[in-house]
């Protein structure tokens, strides 16, 4: 089944109604459909948009080579399309994808938007995902001064004990109806839960997918 076949009739992208520029092109911003990280920007024309809809993977138009290009066709880092939105003027596309290999940029970075004034930084995206990346780094490169590294060293016993303690503190904060305390304790609980995920080699995106399923 193609991507377009999975859409209800009222949600099919009106390819001919998109406002293309004088070159017949429309900008397509691509983002991770789970955490919202902006991955790249490229150009589509009518034909590449239709190919994207038909195949369920992103196809773009190369202005320099004057030809279609299938994202990841050579590297294997394809993009599985999950949604396509167009703006209020119908002259820009927002494409939500599952990025295979978690690499969208030809430099090997996850996102093409990884530089600010020449300095490489983490791409803008979901805060939980960024915190999880830091936690995984502490797991893979432990240091004596890192609290997170000490949790990993203690294994399940230490990690699960902390989750139990933080869960109880969330309950108490809610019982006291203390909004600031609730926010702080839930943050602590989320953090230690992320440590448990990393300890058991469960990617946070697996949790995002479960949450997507539960909201339907």
Curated annotation (Swiss-Prot):
Protein name: Histidine biosynthesis bifunctional protein HisIE
HAMAP family per the UniProt record, alphabetical: HisE, HisI, HisIE
Region (Phosphoribosyl-ATP pyrophosphohydrolase): 128-216
Pathway: Amino-acid biosynthesis; L-histidine biosynthesis; L-histidine from 5-phospho-alpha-D-ribose 1-diphosphate: step 2/9; Amino-acid biosynthesis; L-histidine biosynthesis; L-histidine from 5-phospho-alpha-D-ribose 1-diphosphate: step 3/9
Family, per entry: In the N-terminal section; belongs to the PRA-CH family. In the C-terminal section; belongs to the PRA-PH family.
One Pfam family matching this protein: PRA-CH
Record field: catalytic activity: 1-(5-phospho-beta-D-ribosyl)-ATP + H2O = 1-(5-phospho-beta-D-ribosyl)-5'-AMP + diphosphate + H(+); 1-(5-phospho-beta-D-ribosyl)-5'-AMP + H2O = 1-(5-phospho-beta-D-ribosyl)-5-[(5-phospho-beta-D-ribosylamino)methylideneamino]imidazole-4-carboxamide
UniProt keyword terms in alphabetical order: Amino-acid biosynthesis, ATP-binding, Cytoplasm, Histidine biosynthesis, Hydrolase, Multifunctional enzyme, Nucleotide-binding
Gene Ontology CC: one annotated term: cytoplasm
Record region (Phosphoribosyl-AMP cyclohydrolase): 1-127
Compartments, as annotated in UniProt: Cytoplasm
Listed GO MF terms: ATP binding; phosphoribosyl-AMP cyclohydrolase activity; phosphoribosyl-ATP diphosphatase activity
Natural source organism: Nostoc sp. (strain PCC 7120 / SAG 25.82 / UTEX 2576)
Regions annotated as coiled coil: none
One annotated GO biological process: L-histidine biosynthetic process
Gene3D superfamilies named among the record's database cross-references: MazG-like, Phosphoribosyl-AMP cyclohydrolase
Enzyme category, top tier: hydrolase
